[in-house]
Amino acid sequence: MAMTYVISKYLDEKTAINVRNIAANLEDQRWIRRNELTPPRQVENSTCAYDFCGHSQMPKHAVDFLKNIAPKFEEHRLAEIAINRYNIGDYLGKHKDFDHYRKNLVISLQDSDNGVYIHDDDTFVKDVIGQGVCIDGIGPVHSVAPVNRKRYSLVYLYE
């Protein structure tokens, strides 16, 4: 099975800033700390340390806004929305995505030297506000190295 992904601009800067502001203003109790990766996502005993806020933890106005701006893909239905928050030093080790989602779109909400490393292609995708990596299926092995400043990413999962 071919592992494919597309790097493209998915949100304009103003919209991405609005999403980042929503994320930055979420109360601490809405965030879930993730400290482990487990098979089948985990690759080579990798670990993680970052905060996750799924749509079930978000206020309704945030979910409605994020659904409204979600990119549309023919033959794919939006199934889940999440925001990942990385504080300085946080990371997401080598992993593949779950196989029950057909597309996994991760959009950067800031410009920075941080980003996503795609191991299979030895490619680093630097954070560019509004730019995303859209992975088909489980996709290639990828990770986020320890970040040097606060980082937010918007995640859309499609069935």
What is the role of each PLM region?
Residues 80, 102-105:
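Short glycine-rich loop/turn motifs
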Residues 100, 107, 111-159:
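Catalytic core of Fe(II)/2-oxoglutarate
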Residues 71-75, 95-98:
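Short, conserved, surface-exposed binding loops centered on an aromatic residue
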Residues 74-82:
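A short coil-to-beta-strand element that immediately follows conserved catalytic motifs
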Residues 1-74:
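Non-heme Fe(II)/2-oxoglutarate
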Residues 82-98:
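Conserved short histidine dyad/triad with adjacent acidic residue
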